Amino acid sequence: LMVLPFMEDEHARERTIDELPQSAAGKTIMTTEPKFIPQEAAEIILPELPGSSAGMPQPALSQSVLPGTAIQGSAAQPKIKVRLIDCVGFMVEGASGHMEGNESRMVKTPWSEQEIPFTTAASIGTQKVIRDHATIGIVVTTDGTIGELPRNAYVKAEEHTVEELNAIAKPYVILLNSQKPYSDETMELAAELKEKYQTAVLPVNCEQLRKDDIVRILENILCEFPVTRVEFFIPKWTEMLKPEHPMKAEIIKTASGILDSMHKTGDVRALSFTPEQYVLSLIH
């Protein structure tokens, strides 16, 4: 929707289309190993969208995990390098394709000289994608309306994925894939998952994603990046006041309160402020 149309190199675009992962209905695992799409990150030039600030490109991705995003170029022609990683993920209860008869399917991998069970290989590959390659993550789970498996079959793998992302503070959001994303039941489940995982949970129908949905997903991911620096701008003359001066003390108290409440970039939106004697307002 928002990457392929902006790839100027026709041959690169065709190769990328050929490299896109397959998908199908049912319980059979379609992915066998991590796949980088495209092999070389696609560089695209995005037009400035209505209502956006000059020089602020609006990148997008479709699924899984997006590593190595880099923005460059002038304000008139913002560029972005984007690459998708499609990986097996952690095994969902009831999925098929990881067994040969009654025994685990054994596979050869770059990470071991010996053959290892497919489930183990999938776990190792997914962990490497999360820890070593991805810049941001998208956890795709479901309410159980998209296929043959019930909601509870996904919970263990869902929790494992979130645990891995939280362990390294990787920015991510959760997509709740549903045939009825706007129903009361789905909205209620999304609220429960948001409370459980303390991150944005967006109900969507992945088969019917629109550009607006993708922009909304990316906006929420941007709000999950950790705050590493906060700058305060105060009147120059206040810097000459002693720390114990009532005005200086109130400024320091206000700044400390802001720092204590800001952990992710999205916390700026929720920043609350009560006017005091000297500090009457904040501009952020």
Segments and roles (model prediction):
Residues L1-N102:
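Conserved G1/Walker A P-loop phosphate-binding module
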Residues F6, E10, F90-M91, E164, ...:
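Conserved, well-folded catalytic cores of nucleic-acid-processing
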Residues H98-I116:
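A solvent-exposed, charged loop/short amphipathic helix patch at secondary-structure junctions
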Residues P110-Y197:
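Conserved C-terminal guanine-recognition region of P-loop GTPase G domains, centered on the G4
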Residues Q179-K236:
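Canonical P-loop GTPase G-domain recognition
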Residues F225-K253:
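Extended, charge-rich low-complexity interaction segments
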Residues M247, K253-P275:
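Hard-cation-handling environments
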Residues H284:
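Conserved small/polar residues in nucleotide/adenosyl-binding loops
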